[in-house]
Regions:
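Active-site HxH/HxHxD metal-binding segment of metal-dependent hydrolases
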Residues: 12, 23-26, 33-116, 130-132, ...
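Metallo-beta-lactamase
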Residues: 24, 111, 121-241
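Residue-level marker for buried hydrophobic side chains located in beta-strands
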Residues: 27, 51-53, 140-142, 148, ...
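Active-site metal-binding loops of divalent metal-dependent hydrolases
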Residues: 31-33, 57, 81-82, 120-121, ...
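Histidine-centered catalytic micro-motifs
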Residues: 52-62, 116-124, 191-199, 431-435
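Rhodanese-like catalytic fold shared by cysteine-dependent sulfurtransferases
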Residues: 88-92, 154-156, 168, 215-251, ...
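Short, well-ordered beta-to-alpha junction loops that form the rim of enzyme active sites
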Residues: 193-198, 203-204, 248-250, 286-288, ...
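A contiguous, basic/glycine-rich beta-loop/short-helix subdomain that forms a polymer-engagement track
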Residues: 261-273
Length: 522
């Protein structure tokens, strides 16, 4: 048996190719839209991709199953379990082999048996893999989003991302029963999961690439002895906020996703940047946070390149309007890779790209670059509570449950686009996360939407704790006002700041007496 693992660090997503070394046939499970990586690997291993399948309808990336099966001339297999309401559509299943609980796919002398393991999604399948040259017993299981290293797939996504109202608790109960059945398999069974650490498809995924059922029984909380009621409460507790793009991915993949078209980089200059900013288009500055903080074009959104780039792009960038990118990347090939990554989550409407040199040109023409004020913990301690200063905690619910700054408002970063109206911009705002990275993104998001008096807490919650300052354990306030006080700067007529964006003050809001940086304003 030939076994290949493909891991996409930007998605924290794993797909697999398993082949029979005698017949040179292969099956690919859970491919993403970068189908070329699988065909290249098959060519290198001198095998033919004969079968393509996936464990479930994915919510976090564009499926490559249809595109790969077409490119390789392979048989496509999809789950027929879970009912029609939230399963694959008839269009997606057209021409595909429908899998049921107990269905088998023989790949030469490799046998893949499907087992229905609902909970994360209604149609979810786990694939037990046997090497018939050695015996009938499975060597391992491709568990998709059912069982991870140290965690299990969250059962709330169908409701929170796809809109299936009232499905969360019943899904959690199905997940419990699926785990009970799975737990009777032998301890030596290898577990090959669909995601690793950093994926929002669970809350505490481990970073090990694989595990065994016996190991998970010892160290995975979900296999601990507990009642169904206890499990339901625990699995639903402190789940991370799903990014906004999950809903669109669920819809696209349920219909049968085609391979997205990756746009060629179109390099633009200062006139186009002026136009983009003037029209309130989304412009993503992908430079590191410290460079963005030191000087950026007003109205731009900072999402630094790195492992979390796709996650936060999917959470903060609108799906339909065209958007732009500012990058330090110089070559076409490197930029194509970035655009290819964005296409994996359906963000293909890139209207143009600006090299970071354009910032110097902007400063020459407009005379100023905007900065992100950095506030240290000592200063925040001194000014806390003055003139209605708001502290906004953008960490996950799980992090916040372990303690938070006194009086902090909790708005997870992924929810900021939908909850920006809960922030009263007539008063200064300080944002923080654990170490300062996510709050830097959040600060830029508020600035790009016309909020002027906003600062980032340098070092975040960790720095606050390191200074020995007070931490509360009760749940933080949800908002200060409970009403919408901010509307997106995009598409509204108002006075603009020097950078071409409307500021909170220009919109007629009261100018605060004390700024978020602690300086008294005139």
């Amino acid at each position: 048996m030939l076994f290949r693992r493909f891991y996409d660090e930007n998605l924290a997503q794993t797909s697999y190719m398993i082949a029979c070394e005698k017949t040179h046939e292969a099956i690919v499970v859970d491919p993403n839209s970068d189908v070329a990586q699988y065909t290249r690997a098959a060519g290198a291993d001198r095998v033919r991709i004969a079968h393509v399948t996936e464990t479930h309808i994915h919510a976090d990336f564009v499926s490559g199953a249809h595109a790969l099966a077409k490119a390789a001339g392979a048989v496509l297999h999809f789950s027929g379990e879970g009912g029609s309401e939230w399963g694959y559509t008839a269009h997606a299943l057209e021409g595909a082999n429908v899998l049921r609980d107990g269905s088998r796919i023989d790949v030469g002398r490799i046998r893949v048996r499907a087992a229905h393991t609902p909970g994360h999604t209604p149609e979810h399948l786990t694939f037990f893999v046997s090497d018939l040259a050695r015996g009938l017993d499975p060597v391992g299981a491709l568990t998709g989003d059912f069982v991870f290293v140290g965690d299990v797939g969250r059962p709330d996504l169908l409701e929170r991302a796809a809109g299936a109202k009232g499905s969360t608790e019943s899904s959690a109960r199905k997940l419990f029963r699926s785990l009970q059945e799975f737990g009777i398999e032998p301890d030596h069974l290898q577990i090959w999961p669909g995601h690793g650490a950093g994926s929002p498809c669970g809350k505490s995924l481990g970073s090990m690439p694989q595990s065994t059922l016996g190991y998970e029984k010892l160290f995975n909380w979900a296999f601990a002895k507990m009642s169904e009621e206890e499990f339901v409460a625990k699995v639903l507790e402190d789940q991370p906020v799903p990014p906004r793009y999950f809903a669109e991915m669920k819809r696209v993949n349920r219909l049968g996703a085609e391979r997205p078209t990756t746009p060629e980089p179109t390099w633009l200059g200062l006139p186009e940047l002026d136009s983009a900013i003037g029209s309130h288009a989304t412009v993503i500055d992908t430079r590191p946070a410290h460079k963005f903080a030191a000087g950026h074009v007003p109205g731009t959104l900072n999402i630094p390149l790195g492992k979390s780039f796709l996650n936060w792009s999917g959470a903060l960038v609108p799906e339909t309007p065209d958007f732009y990118i500012i990058t330090e990347t110089a070559s076409d090939d490197a930029m194509k890779n970035i655009l290819g990554d964005l296409s994996k989550i359906g963000l293909t409407r890139v209207a143009g790209v600006f090299r970071s040199d354009v910032l110097r040109e902007w400063k020459v023409r407009h005379g100023v670059l905007e900065r992100v004020p950095q506030l240290d913990s000592t200063t925040l301690k001194e000014i806390a509570g003055r003139d209605g200063l708001q502290v906004v905690d953008v960490r996950s619910p799980e992090e916040v449950s372990g303690g938070h700054l006194p009086g902090a408002i909790h708005i997870p970063l992924a929810q900021l686009p939908d909850r920006i109206g809960e922030i009263d911009t007539s008063a200064p705002v300080v944002l923080h996360c654990r170490g300062g990275g996510r709050s830097s993104i959040a600060t830029s998001f508020l600035q790009s939407h016309g909020v002027s008096d906003v600062s980032n807490l340098a070092g975040g919650f960790d720095a606050w704790v390191a200074h020995g300052f007070e931490v509360e354990s009760a749940k933080p306030a949800k908002s200060v006002t409970g009403r919408k006080t901010v509307k997106s700067a995009r598409g509204r007529k108002a006075a603009k700041s020097a950078g071409g964006r409307q500021s909170a003050t220009a919109a007629g809001r009261r100018k605060p007496t004390i700024s978020a940086s602690g300086r008294r304003k005139k």
